């Protein structure tokens, strides 16, 4: 069974993705990807996870740009979803991709040492 919070989260994901393509003109927002949206059970808060392709400074600038556009994004969500309460939007950098790359580099390092021992 699919929860309502999951459905609303998916819709918010679509809305924000479309806004990034068409509506947001903030130059601080770099090349970013929305990786997921997690809703609270009462649908009052949406945590939007994103990744940025670039340096740490690009990550900070993109997060600042997203936070400055919070009001506009929330207004657009409210118009699209027509819910009684429009969820508060929080933006968080998704560290799972960085963590995955770190694990992958460790596994490659282990594989390289195993190959060296077998020779």
Swiss-Prot record:
One example GO MF annotation: ribosomal small subunit binding
Keywords, alphabetical: Cytoplasm, Ribosome biogenesis
Pfam family, one: RBFA
Compartment(s) of residence: Cytoplasm
GO cellular component: cytosol
Annotated SUPFAM superfamilies: Ribosome-binding factor A, RbfA
Keyword Repressor recorded: no
One of the GO biological process terms: maturation of SSU-rRNA
HAMAP family: RbfA
Protein task: One of several proteins that assist in the late maturation steps of the functional core of the 30S ribosomal subunit. Associates with free 30S ribosomal subunits (but not with 30S subunits that are part of 70S ribosomes or polysomes). Required for efficient processing of 16S rRNA. May interact with the 5'-terminal helix region of 16S rRNA.
Similarity comment: Belongs to the RbfA family.
Known partners and oligomeric status: Monomer. Binds 30S ribosomal subunits, but not 50S ribosomal subunits or 70S ribosomes.
Name assigned to this protein: Ribosome-binding factor A
């Amino acid at each position: 069974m699919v929860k309502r919070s999951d459905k609303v989260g998916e819709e918010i994901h679509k809305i924000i993705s479309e806004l990034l393509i068409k509506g947001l003109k903030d130059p601080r927002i770099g090349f970013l990807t929305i990786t997921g949206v997690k809703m609270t059970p009462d649908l009052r808060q949406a945590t939007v996870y994103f990744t940025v392709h670039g340096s740490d400074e690009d990550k900070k600038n993109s997060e600042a740009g997203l936070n400055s556009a919070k009001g506009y994004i929330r207004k657009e969500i409210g118009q699209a979803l027509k819910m009684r309460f429009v969820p508060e939007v929080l933006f968080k950098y998704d560290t799972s991709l960085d963590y995955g790359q770190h694990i992958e580099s460790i596994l490659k390092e282990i594989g390289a040492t195993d190959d060296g021992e077998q020779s």
